[in-house]
A protein has these predicted regions:
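Catalytic-core helical/loop segments in enzymes performing group transfer/polymerization on anionic/lipid-linked
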Residues: 1-417
Length: 417
């Protein structure tokens, strides 16, 4: 906005930090997308920095020395990983995990972790974050979006070595699905004992509402707390107003996800059920990193002949217009409840079910397993009035996410009260 950087997913926290006179240094992780690369990212960061923001890109901290060191560490890790696997009794690797017949899967995961890309990425990320903490003095807090990914463990491990006085705050910013195994370790694995073998976790693991807090608390994270759901605060306005339907013609909104295979299954089912959109509109909204155009082309589906519509507007605008939403593993399912949409969730035989509504204490959704089920359910709900549904759903959404726009919990955490 006007040459200044605004964090779309964290604007309320950004504004609160400005209000509290807490300076911000942004560290960006590059995701090559839509023609952007490291060079263009650094140029953009510099242009925004000239307007008063302090923005750094992870790629700026790469050096020949770092890459050589990372390569040596990786070779050492390969020797240890391969040697340990070769000399270890394989029954030890499967005894408490699975059966002996699953050893090929265990071997694949072992090699991927100790030899493959995950190992290389982890080492490079760790060395990069050590350079980051060396280069930026007197960091009070390090706040990041927590999804329990490997780079987060690299960040926390590097912080303990280079900047132990810095407090890391991992903010769980969307939803937590019970089948998202990266969150659900054994309790002994997440116990912090001030030992080098401790799992590198943030100093504060911040959930964004009562439901996710209770779910994560089952694992007994010792540093678990709660704050407001800054990405979803806009829903408080939606829940407080009377719903007014913005379209006279019913709309089925189909929401794609990150996984291309799952998105392809989603589109295929819609096409088999409704090869042409006649009585109601069918809109398709893709995930940013998984554009739908190429998937339609691979499936041989002509969007124009089917009378489908590809939409790119903000999800809130689309949900306000939609009558029903067809969505697999996505936070959009919860947002659709806030807008009073009928939610239809597919259960594909070759995809793990990761929809947040399935885990929550909410039952007003449809779980379908076949094209016939999907077609019948859409025809049953697409023309229904949404007012009653919306009223019934308000309390559920407010109980799932903390939607207090005044941010009292965030204020106390940022001020370390």
């Amino acid at each position: 906005q006007q040459g200044k950087f605004r964090n779309k997913y964290g604007t309320p926290i950004q504004d609160k930090l400005y209000e509290l006179n807490i300076p911000i240094t942004w560290l960006m992780i590059l995701v090559p997308y839509n023609g952007h690369n490291l060079e263009s990212a650094i140029k953009l960061a510099k242009r925004l920095s000239d307007n008063g923001e302090k923005i750094l890109v992870m790629g700026e901290f790469v050096s020949i020395r770092l890459l050589l060191k990372g390569t040596l560490w990786w070779l050492f890790q390969v020797a240890k990983g391969v040697g340990f696997y070769y000399f270890t009794d394989k029954k030890i690797l499967t005894r408490h995990l699975t059966s002996q017949e699953c050893l090929p899967y265990v071997k694949y995961l072992w090699q991927h972790s100790f030899v493959g890309l995950s190992c290389v990425a982890g080492i490079i990320d760790y060395l990069l974050y050590r350079n980051v903490f060396k280069s930026i003095p007197k960091i009070g807090d390090c706040l990041y979006y927590c999804e329990m990914q490997a780079w987060e463990k690299a960040l926390n491990a590097a912080k303990k070595i280079e900047s132990p006085a810095t407090r890391t705050l991992g903010f769980q910013h969307t939803v937590v699905e019970r089948n998202h195994y990266k969150y659900f370790y054994h309790r002994d694995d997440v116990r912090q004992c001030n030992k080098p073998t401790d799992m590198p976790l943030p100093d504060l693991l911040i959930s964004n509402g009562r439901f996710t807090h209770s779910l994560l608390n089952e694992i007994q994270y010792s540093n678990l707390c709660q704050a407001e759901a800054v990405r979803q605060l806009y829903l408080s306005n939606i829940l407080d107003k009377e719903y007014v339907k913005s379209s006279s013609r019913p709309i089925l909104l189909v929401v794609g996800v990150l996984g291309q295979h799952e998105t392809m299954s989603l589109i295929s089912m819609v096409y088999r059920a409704f090869p042409v959109a006649n009585q109601f509109d069918i809109w398709f909204k893709g995930y940013p990193c998984t554009p739908l155009e190429s998937i339609f082309a691979d499936l041989g589906i002509d969007v124009n002949e089917s009378n489908y519509k590809m939409v790119h507007s903000d999800i809130a605008v689309l949900l306000e217009a939609a009558s029903a939403v067809f969505v697999p593993s996505s936070t959009v399912a919860l947002e659709a409840v806030a807008f009073g949409c009928s939610v239809i969730i597919p259960l594909f035989p070759d995809t793990m079910l990761m929809n947040p509504l399935v885990d929550a204490a909410y039952h007003d959704y449809s779980l379908i397993t076949s094209t016939d089920d999907f077609k019948a359910r859409v025809e049953d709900v697409i023309f229904k009035n949404r007012d009653a549904v919306c009223e019934k759903s308000k309390e559920f959404v407010k109980n799932y996410w903390n939607l207090d726009k005044t941010l009292p919990l965030w204020t106390r955490k940022l001020l370390k009260n």
